[in-house]
Amino acid sequence: MFARIARINPKILPFVIGAPTIALCSYYYSSGAFLRNESSKVFIGDNNWIDLPISRIEEISHDTKRFTFKYPSQDSVSGLVVASALLTKFVTPKGSNVIRPYTPVSDVDEKGSLDLVIKHYPDGKMTNHIFSLKVNDTLSFKGPIPKWKWVPNSFESITLIGGGTGITPLYQLIHAITKNPNDKTKIRLFYSNKTSQDVLMKKELDELQAKYPDQLRITYFITTPDKGYKGESGFISKEFIASNADKPSPKSHVFVCGPPPFMNAYSGDKKSPTDQGELVGILKELGYTIDQVYKF
């Protein structure tokens, strides 16, 4: 046997030895890449809070700002999935924890930072705190909080019904669908606000609608329109939904997000973060079932 090995052509010996070596190196390389990808995720679902500094503050409207928070590394990514949220926390001077959930509007795969669009409520403990922060100040985060697990092409079409700051998870869903060339889901967004100045993410939404006119259709509703306003005024009516949303069907789905009065009018609010509760309101009156509606 050894004589046979000795007679192997020396010209091919490096290739005989090299094949398993390459396979072994390939395994370690791919394993290392996987570990690096995993370690680059900022939020991994553990119970630890992480403090992130503010790197930028952009004023969007009279009561809304976009806050950019910097990750520990420029190569870090969120670790979030589409339509998931994060918990934020600060400690009051008396030592009490104030914790609130927020959905980032930045891409879940964006490197280096995340963006929150936050509306200031005068009686809101968290929004008062965040609006008092300056660049380089920090805020504590934990997550992710998974919500709806989006699978491309799960439905032929979806209807998104949003009010005010409820646009954030809906925008994240719109952005994820439209950026995926293999996801052919049709999207209708009905978005309600008090005034034209209150419409959040309008620039981004309009750009997406212009870029994907065959896939995304947006209707804005203003309840107290300015003089000369030419869009839809008033609330998102039962009649409008009946005429413009898909009829209840396994091939379509409805997603709703907004403040409590808004939720109560259209779908009813959730019982808890993990319990959707029963379906009530306009969507139930139109024949939808709880299996066809998701409340963010």
UniProtKB/Swiss-Prot annotation:
| A GO CC term assigned to this protein in UniProt | mitochondrial outer membrane
* Membrane topology per record: Single-pass membrane protein
Which PROSITE patterns has this protein been placed in? FAD_FR (PS51384)
Q: Does the keyword Oxidoreductase apply?
A: yes
Q: Is Glycoprotein given among the entry's keywords?
A: no
Write the record's keywords in alphabetical order, separated by commas. Answer: FAD, Flavoprotein, Membrane, Mitochondrion, Mitochondrion outer membrane, NAD, Oxidoreductase, Transmembrane, Transmembrane helix
Q: Which reaction does it catalyse?
A: 2 Fe(III)-[cytochrome b5] + NADH = 2 Fe(II)-[cytochrome b5] + NAD(+) + H(+)
Named from the GO MF annotations, one term is:
NADH dehydrogenase activity
Where found, per UniProt?
A: Mitochondrion outer membrane
What residues does FAD bind to? 154-189
Note the InterPro entries from the entry. CBR-like, Cbr1-like_FAD-bd_dom, FAD-bd_FR_type, Flavoprot_Pyr_Nucl_cyt_Rdtase, FNR_nucleotide-bd, OxRdtase_FAD/NAD-bd, Riboflavin_synthase-like_b-brl
Listed under GO biological process in this entry are: cellular response to oxidative stress; ergosterol biosynthetic process
Q: Where is the FAD-binding FR-type domain?
A: 47-151
Q: What is its EC number?
A: 1.6.2.2
Q: Which cofactor does it need?
A: FAD
Family of the protein in this entry: Belongs to the flavoprotein pyridine nucleotide cytochrome reductase family.
Job description of the protein? May mediate the reduction of outer membrane cytochrome b5.
What is the official name of this protein in its record?
NADH-cytochrome b5 reductase 2-A
What organism does the record attribute this protein to?
A: Vanderwaltozyma polyspora (strain ATCC 22028 / DSM 70294 / BCRC 21397 / CBS 2163 / NBRC 10782 / NRRL Y-8283 / UCD 57-17)
